């Protein structure tokens, strides 16, 4: 609290543009234009929620709802229950995925436009490469797996699955 008061006194120009209100558990800073009433010119919560691979800032209503849930739960962040996910083609675990990958690599031929029965996992990564870039892409990827090569032979299951899309 002292730090905010010090900042307030240091910049007398800024002094007219914000008010500090003491709450029970926190301090609220209201910004406003000097010639008008105490109407906030900016509302920022500084609370973020994670969605998939990114973080987005909560708006004031989401923040209020989150903080009230947090208070009701005694300080623990409420966790939504995970929905049951139905895996395509009956693939449910890494053992099934590894079995399907092994069957895929043991085949002698592949069909153009063929779809695979497994998704990304710890050991499988799909990559799209044009036919022109295939040789270059393989040359780039092989050195990344050299630490897995005890006898200078590549284990095909440890490589990325390269799906060719001709452009």
Curated annotation (Swiss-Prot):
Biological classification of the source: Viruses, Varidnaviria, Bamfordvirae, Nucleocytoviricota, Pokkesviricetes
Pfam families xref list: B3R (PF17057)
Name of the protein in question: Schlafen-like protein
Family the entry assigns: Belongs to the Schlafen family. Subgroup poxviridae B3 subfamily.
InterPro entries: Poxin-SLFN/SLFN_N
């Amino acid at each position: 609290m002292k730090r905010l008061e010090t900042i307030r006194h240091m910049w007398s120009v800024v002094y007219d543009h914000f008010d500090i209100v003491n709450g029970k558990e926190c301090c609220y800073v209201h910004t406003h234009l000097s010639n008008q009433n105490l109407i906030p010119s900016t509302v920022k919560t500084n609370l973020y929620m994670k969605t998939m691979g990114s973080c987005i800032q909560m708006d004031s209503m989401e923040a209020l709802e989150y903080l009230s849930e947090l208070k009701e739960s005694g300080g623990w962040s409420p966790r939504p229950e995970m929905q049951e996910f139905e895996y395509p083609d009956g693939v449910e675990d890494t053992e099934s995925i590894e079995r399907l990958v092994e069957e895929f690599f043991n085949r002698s031929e592949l069909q153009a436009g063929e779809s695979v029965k497994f998704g990304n996992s710890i050991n499988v990564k799909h990559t799209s490469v044009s036919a022109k870039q295939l040789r270059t892409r393989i040359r780039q990827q092989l050195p990344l797996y050299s630490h897995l090569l005890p006898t200078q032979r590549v284990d095909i299951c440890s490589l990325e699955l390269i799906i060719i899309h001709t452009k």
